[in-house]
Amino acid sequence: MKHSKKIVTALLALAMSQTVMAAPVALDRVSVQINDGIILESEIGNMLATVRANANKSNQTLPSEQALRTQVIERLILTRLQLQMAERIGLQIGDLQLDQTIESIAKDQKLTVSQLQQQLENDGLSFSQYREQLREEITLGEIQRIQVQRRIQVSPQEISGLVKLMQEQGLKEVEFQIGHILIDVPSEPSSEQLEASSKRANIVLKRLNEGEDFRSTAIASSSGPKALEGGIWDYMNINEMPTLFAEVVNGAKVGDIIGPIKSGSGFHIIKVMDARGLQTKEVEEVKSRHILLKPSPILSEERAKAMLVNFQKQILSGEADFAELARQYSEDPGSAAKGGELGWSSPDVYVPEFAQTLNSLKENEMSEPFRTTHGWHLTQLMDKRKTDATEQFNSNRAHQLIFRRKFNEELQAWLDEMRSDAYIEVFEPEVNRG
């Protein structure tokens, strides 16, 4: 599960921060100012320690200390800008939602929350720090979804066009793991700046062709969004990857290095790291219903959850009917009139918490109240079925592929816009700002 993968990163980051805190340290100082916010030297040090630990674990060579520090500062700047945006729009991840996420993580690990906490403490980790790091991860995911999703439109013509293309390609599709290095150029660059960036890109390409490690080179040289991950993008189908990638990867072989490719953001170097065939299988669809309560100034988080707990008791005891409660109380206008019924669909069309809950239920089983970005839910899995890749499924899949591609492109555009509009000042290590 997605949260299961994140826990490893979170644990490692916490281990490093504990190590730093345990040793005597010099007085902390401001290293970066971002609008009205700051990044402390200790934050940079903690992330540097985490990156080094990850590199040691995977036997990965790292670039020079200065190059690594630059990448870490850039990552922290983008993170802080997103958190500032979340604060401006009033986005907060409450303790109840955080508790629910931790319960899901523990369940994925086949642990209770107490066992998870004990496991963290046995490793010398602070459970409170782990909670706050997780809160930040959820906040970043939510602010990206809120701000980027509204920039994306997927037209019926795009969907039908991709469905037709997928049918022409047949079922033997391929997913690619892409390596990406971006040598950026300033906004409105001069001809001299363009030439300098072009030369840098060609030097990087020459080193790669001579056998230099791609991941180390990306960490040292790239200004792309995945630089700290060695420039590696996870497996993507041609139809969901950013357009720039798709245009050059189609027909390429594993190991091919392509570039430099010029775009508005700079010069790109792309390497096909790996490729694999998509596994074709039957699709499981679920029929479900739910009751949604949305917290507000009038309805608190605690009250919304308590109401659903009471509904659950009434339904289980036979005092109330799920459909009638949904019609009377649910704040989902699309399903309330139908007794909360959502119809048949693949679980992955829903937000992750809802999909995860549906996947954990047996037929006719009702969930405990749980929180998503939409509010508090009580859901029941009514039925399951296996289906072939029907026309509707192909349309849904085409929509998802197009949406993911546009999301990746728009996310980077949004981050670039925020960064260019922000006041950012980086203070050199030797400058003491008291």
Swiss-Prot record:
Any GO molecular function: peptidyl-prolyl cis-trans isomerase activity
Extent of the signal sequence: 1-22
Coiled coil: none
Listed InterPro entries: OMP_Chaperone_SurA, PPIase_dom_sf, PPIase_PpiC, PPIase_PpiC_CS, PPIase_SurA, SurA_N, Trigger_fact/SurA_dom_sf
Isomerase found in the keyword field: yes
Cellular localisation: Periplasm
Biological process, per Gene Ontology: Gram-negative-bacterium-type cell outer membrane assembly; protein folding; protein stabilization
A Pfam family assignment: Rotamase
Occurrences of domain PpiC (ranges): 173-274, 283-383
Gene3D superfamilies: 3.10.50.40, Porin chaperone SurA, peptide-binding domain
This enzyme's EC code(s): 5.2.1.8
Catalytic activity: [protein]-peptidylproline (omega=180) = [protein]-peptidylproline (omega=0)
Major localization class: periplasm
GO CC annotation terms, alphabetical: outer membrane-bounded periplasmic space
Keywords: Chaperone, Isomerase, Periplasm, Repeat, Rotamase, Signal
Top-level taxonomic group: Bacteria
Domain notes: The PPIase activity resides only in the second parvulin domain. The N-terminal region and the C-terminal tail are necessary and sufficient for the chaperone activity of SurA. The PPIase activity is dispensable for SurA to function as a chaperone. The N-terminal region and the C-terminal tail are also required for porin recognition.
Function in brief: Chaperone involved in the correct folding and assembly of outer membrane proteins. Recognizes specific patterns of aromatic residues and the orientation of their side chains, which are found more frequently in integral outer membrane proteins. May act in both early periplasmic and late outer membrane-associated steps of protein maturation.
Name assigned to this protein: Chaperone SurA
Organism: Shewanella denitrificans (strain OS217 / ATCC BAA-1090 / DSM 15013)
